[in-house]
C-alpha cells in the first residue's frame, strides 16, 4: 500500500473519531435543549405577567419619588452580560457580546457584571471594570442565582456606584434563531413598547398603596429585578443549547462529507495502484517473451 493511501486511511480514521465526538455532543445538547425548553415554557408566561404588572404599577405612581425609579445624572453605567461558560455554540457568545459592546460604546464610563466564562474573559482581556462575575450557572440557572446577581446590581445602584443598570441576554425564538436583547433595569421606567404594543394604562386616581407607595415599591422592584434576571438566564440557557445542537449537527454533517470525499480519494488511489500493478505484471511478461 502506497504512502498516499496510508495517509488517507489515517485521515479517515481521525475524521471519523471527531465525527463520533460531535455526534455524541449533538445528542447530549438535544436532550439538554428539550429540558431547557420545558423550563422556558413554564417560566415565560409568569415573568411576562410580572413585567406587565410592575409596568402598570410604575405607570400609576407618577409623581412618587423612589430611589429605584427616579433618574439621576449618569456618570457610570453597569451592564449585566449573560454568556456561556464554554464555546462550541456557533455565534451565540459572539452575538450577545457584540450587542453589549455596541450599546455601551455610547456611554462615557461602564462596568460589567459578567455571567459566564466567555463574557468574563472577553471583557477582562480588554480592560473593562468587572463589578462581579458568576460562572457555572449558565447551563442550568436557578432562581437563587438570579437573586444573587440582582442583589449585586441593586447594591451598586443604591450606593450610587453606578447610575444605570442594563441587562444583555439572548432571547430564544427557535432552535436556529436567537435574538440578543438589551433591557434597562434601573432606574425602572414604564416600557412604552414598539409598534403594536399595548399602551400603558392610565393612572387610577382611586388606587392606593398600603402602607405607602414607597414601601410597596421597596418590596416589588427587587422581586421584579430578580424575575427579569431569572427569565433572561432561562432564555439564554435555552438559546445556548439550541446553538450548540445546531453547531454540533453541522460539524457532524461536515465530517460525514469529508469522510465521503476521503473515501473517494482512497478508492481512486487504490484503483490506480491496482492498475499500475497489472501494467507492471503485463510489462514483465512481455519482457520474458
Curated annotation (Swiss-Prot):
Molecular function GO labels: ATP binding; proton-transporting ATP synthase activity, rotational mechanism
PROSITE patterns in the record: ATPASE_GAMMA
Signal peptide coordinates: none
Record localization: Cell membrane
Record keywords: ATP synthesis, Cell membrane, CF(1), Hydrogen ion transport, Ion transport, Membrane, Transport
Gene Ontology cellular component annotations, sorted alphabetically: plasma membrane; proton-transporting ATP synthase complex
CDD domains associated with the record: F1-ATPase_gamma (cd12151)
Transmembrane helix is among the record's keywords: no
GO biological process: proton motive force-driven plasma membrane ATP synthesis
Superkingdom of origin organism: Bacteria
InterPro entries associated with the record: ATP_synth_F1_ATPase_gsu, ATP_synth_F1_gsu, ATP_synth_F1_gsu_CS
A Pfam family annotated for this UniProt entry: ATP-synt
Description of how the protein assembles with itself and partners: F-type ATPases have 2 components, CF(1) - the catalytic core - and CF(0) - the membrane proton channel. CF(1) has five subunits: alpha(3), beta(3), gamma(1), delta(1), epsilon(1). CF(0) has three main subunits: a, b and c.
Protein family according to the UniProt entry: Belongs to the ATPase gamma chain family.
Physiological role: Produces ATP from ADP in the presence of a proton gradient across the membrane. The gamma chain is believed to be important in regulating ATPase activity and the flow of protons through the CF(0) complex.
Protein name according to UniProt: ATP synthase gamma chain
Organism: Alkaliphilus metalliredigens (strain QYMF)
